[in-house]
Swiss-Prot record:
This is Formate-dependent phosphoribosylglycinamide formyltransferase. InterPro entries: ATP-grasp, ATP-grasp_carboxylate-amine, ATP_grasp_subdomain_1, PreATP-grasp_dom_sf, PurT, PurT/PurK_preATP-grasp, PurT_C, Rudment_hybrid_motif. Keywords: ATP-binding, Ligase, Magnesium, Metal-binding, Nucleotide-binding, Purine biosynthesis. It catalyses: N(1)-(5-phospho-beta-D-ribosyl)glycinamide + formate + ATP = N(2)-formyl-N(1)-(5-phospho-beta-D-ribosyl)glycinamide + ADP + phosphate + H(+). GO terms for cellular component: cytosol. Homodimer. Belongs to the PurK/PurT family. Residues 119-308 form the ATP-grasp domain. Coiled coil: none annotated. The keyword Kinase does not apply. Mg(2+) binds at E267, E279. The lineage of its organism: Bacteria, Pseudomonadati, Pseudomonadota, Gammaproteobacteria, Enterobacterales. The keyword Metal-binding applies.
């Protein structure tokens, strides 16, 4: 049985978000709907989830001492990481002292970098993955590329949104790719993964919920990537029954091995009936923002329900839907959005994240749309996103 207190009262149930971006903002809103007290933590002030939290803190979350201090001060009942760049050793210590880390500290630590989760998936669970090697020096990087072969992809073991990633076709690109990877890691320069290129028909995110009433799957989410970050996503992605069954088997193995309750974004490559594991995030996934319009329970609502210990039951998918990012390029600390009225309409919504500034290219919002089919939904979402004019 789940007992929930009332926010700002002595018996309040407190949730602390470690990372307060647009995904954390939606988690905070779902917590608010249940009267939960929300504390948002990030490395910069006025982050999106801070706008809808009861309190907020600005710290370097890779600083274990600072992280322990804010957790000790706030005494949250649930610690909910939204990003990878966190002092996970401290989270494991705190979990050992009785605190509840979502989904669990081990999952957060293993998925903090690509090495932990790749070794779990390929070497412990025996799941199909791309060929790979790890390297922690430029010399070992050259050896890794030689072993994997061209073409290949290099990524920092800890990065997101395509930062530090390069697609390598020839030896002439190696020096530049190594340097770019060293600049793009979340925790600074360091170890990289070199991956062989997988031939696939499409990529999916299989949003997988581990809850008290078992493992549940959302309909597969298809998506298009550009420069290492998603541009559009849609649901459901059409695939064969056999491929879907294999995808669900892989996702089930991964989330049960990681442990804990919550929603996981399991990324997979699909080629015909074959499915290859790519990555997993033990939290809501950016491509899953489409579920804000496509399901009765969004990925954020499912995450909260699961980590609070509530049953999920069934997940209802309404039909073809899509999301398209609003991704302007400018420099401003006073961003405004014009022409939003022309973007919204029947079956079309816009979410603006409220990020405090932009310096270059940054995802500031998302358009959501339904359609008679996925193709129509994608067109409607892209058209809506393009109509929003961002100024600064």
């Amino acid at each position: 049985m789940t007992l929930l207190g009332t926010a700002l009262r002595p018996a309040a149930t407190r949730v602390m978000l470690l990372g307060a971006g647009e995904l954390g903002k939606e988690v905070a809103i779902e917590c608010q709907r249940l009267g939960i007290e929300v504390i948002a933590v990030d490395r910069y002030p006025d982050a999106p989830a801070m706008h809808v939290a009861h309190r907020s803190h600005v710290i370097n979350m890779l600083d274990g001492e600072a992280l322990r201090h804010v957790i000790t001060e706030e005494k949250p009942h649930y610690i909910v990481p939204e990003i990878e760049a966190i002092a996970t050793d401290t989270l494991r210590e705190l979990e050992g002292e009785g605190l509840n880390v979502v989904p669990c500290a081990r999952a957060t630590q293993l998925t903090m970098n690509r090495e932990g989760i790749r070794r779990l998936a390929a070497e412990e669970l025996g799941l199909p993955t791309s060929t790979y090697r790890f390297a922690d020096s430029e010399a070992s990087f050259h050896d890794a590329v030689a072993a994997v072969g061209f073409p290949c992809i290099v990524k920092p073991v800890m990065s997101s949104s395509g930062k530090g990633q390069s697609f390598i076709h020839s030896a002439e690109q190696l020096a530049q790719a190594w340097e770019y990877a060293q600049q793009g890691g979340r925790a600074g320069a360091g170890r990289v993964i070199v991956e062989g290129v997988v031939k696939f028909d499409f990529e999916i995110t299989l949003l997988t919920v581990s809850a008290v009433d078992g493992v549940h799957f959302c309909a597969p989410v298809g998506h298009r990537q550009q420069d290492g970050d998603y541009r559009e996503s849609w649901q459901p992605q059409q695939m064969s029954e056999l491929a879907l069954k294999r995808a669900q088997e892989i996702a089930r193995h991964v989330v049960l091995a990681l442990g804990g309750h919550g929603l996981f974004g399991v990324e997979l490559f699909v080629c015909g009936d074959e499915v290859i594991f790519s990555e997993v995030s033990p939290r809501p996934h950016d491509t899953g923002m489409v579920t804000l319009i496509s399901q009765d329970l969004s990925e954020f609502a499912l995450h909260v329900r699961a980590f609070l210990g509530m049953p999920v039951g069934a997940i209802r998918q309404y039909g073809p839907a899509a999301s398209a990012v609003i991704l302007p390029q400018l420099t401003s600390q006073n961003v405004t959005f014009d022409n939003v009225h022309a973007a919204v309409g029947a079956g079309v919504q816009v979410r603006l994240f409220g990020k405090p500034e932009i310096d270059g290219s940054r995802r500031l919002g998302v358009a959501l749309a339904t359609g008679e089919n996925v193709e129509e939904a994608v067109i409607r979402a892209k058209k809506a996103a393009s109509r929003v004019t961002v100024k600064g």
